[in-house]
């Protein structure tokens, strides 16, 4: 008699092995070629700040556009392959132009490749050497204090938005820092980062993107840090905080926006299921303060993330009570 269940399990193992082997290269291909130029047009009041970080032992470059004295901020976080010259939101979208005179200060930290914008256990050692990653401390303590003191930006009642790697980071930052971030946007994120083989896949992707090790970040897969940084497991915190959420993930099918390539299609389809699970967890915890866009066509590419950032602008302005500027 044929052991059908055994064959299914074997095929499942092979599929997982195949996914683990190909995921890093797919992420690399979907991310596109690096560029040294920014999108923002000349004339926009974009500043290039150097913000001191005691936690990281160096100054961090931050691209910044002021929304006015006392304005709330929108922190835009980059993907796994974040560069050290410009934030990906400026390289790949016209975010500064879209949000010009919106009443929202736009804050784009630069760098943090493979960081998950987290406080790492150990030095972040990769192909370029070792550095200190204490991004959560920087984003939730050092940077808001500096912006408040030096640019009159509100240190509370703000928003954090991220794509891919940083989508889950945005939710986690809002879960643990609810006074600062009353709004969190997650675009095409992996939402079950501590479950199954996800820690191994994340480690492989981080190794491909800079030679980093996931164990230096959150320890072995059974370490509590993995659960702390898992959006599905922290959905209840977001509900308890009444954080306003904007959660997007395409289904892996390209639309007229583009992003028609196998890596981008595969990756979006790969993370889509975890977004549905997050929605279930959020609803199951009694959540009622979220926008979920999970049914539309879309791939793992900037065309869709830019469209979402543009679409959420009125929602951000309303939630953060921004006062648009004129002139």
Swiss-Prot record:
It comes from the Bacteria. Gene3D superfamilies: alpha/beta hydrolase. It is an enzyme of class 2 (transferase). One of its GO terms (cellular component) is extracellular region. The keyword Nucleus does not apply. Disulfide bonds join 125-130. It catalyses: 2 alpha,alpha'-trehalose 6-mycolate = alpha,alpha'-trehalose 6,6'-bismycolate + alpha,alpha-trehalose; an acyl-CoA + a 1,2-diacyl-sn-glycerol = a triacyl-sn-glycerol + CoA. Residues 1-38 form the signal peptide. Substrate binds at residues 80-81, 164, 192, 270-273, 277, 300-302. The active site is at 164 (nucleophile), 268, 300. InterPro entries: AB_hydrolase_fold (IPR029058), Esterase-like (IPR000801), Mycobacterial_A85_antigen (IPR050583). Residues 96-106 are annotated as: Fibronectin-binding. Belongs to the mycobacterial A85 antigen family. This is Diacylglycerol acyltransferase/mycolyltransferase Ag85B. It comes from Mycobacterium leprae (strain TN). The gene is fbpB.
């Amino acid at each position: 008699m044929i052991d059908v269940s055994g064959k299914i399990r074997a095929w499942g193992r092979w599929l997982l092995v195949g996914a683990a082997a190909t995921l890093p290269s797919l992420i690399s291909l979907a991310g596109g070629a690096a560029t040294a130029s920014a999108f923002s047009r000349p004339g926009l009041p974009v500043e290039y700040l150097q913000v001191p970080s005691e936690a990281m032992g160096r100054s961090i470059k931050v691209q910044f556009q002021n929304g006015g004295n006392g304005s709330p901020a929108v922190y835009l976080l980059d993907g796994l392959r974040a560069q050290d010259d410009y934030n990906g939101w400026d390289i790949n979208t016209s975010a500064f132009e879209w949000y010009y005179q919106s009443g929202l200060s736009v804050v784009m930290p630069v760098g943090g490749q493979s960081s998950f914008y987290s406080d790492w256990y150990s030095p972040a050692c990769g192909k370029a050497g070792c550095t200190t990653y204490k991004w959560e401390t920087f984003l939730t303590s050092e940077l808001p204090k500096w912006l408040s003191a030096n640019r009159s930006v509100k240190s509370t009642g703000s928003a954090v938005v991220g794509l891919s790697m940083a989508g889950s980071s945005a939710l986690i930052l809002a879960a643990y820092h609810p006074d600062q971030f009353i709004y969190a946007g997650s675009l095409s994120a992996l939402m079950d980062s501590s479950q199954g083989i996800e820690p191994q896949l994340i480690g492989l992707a981080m190794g491909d993107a800079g030679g980093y090790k996931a164990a230096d970040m959150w320890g072995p897969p059974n370490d509590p840090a993995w659960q702390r940084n898992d959006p599905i497991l922290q959905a209840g915190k977001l509900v308890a905080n009444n954080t306003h959420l904007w959660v997007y993930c395409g289904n892996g099918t390209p639309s007229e926006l583009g992003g028609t390539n196998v890596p981008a299609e595969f990756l979006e389809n790969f993370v889509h299921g975890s977004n549905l699970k997050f929605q279930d967890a959020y609803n199951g915890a009694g959540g009622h303060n979220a926008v979920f866009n999970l049914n539309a066509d879309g791939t793992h590419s900037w065309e869709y993330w830019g469209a979402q950032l543009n679409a959420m602008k009125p929602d951000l302005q309303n939630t953060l009570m921004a006062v648009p500027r004129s002139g």
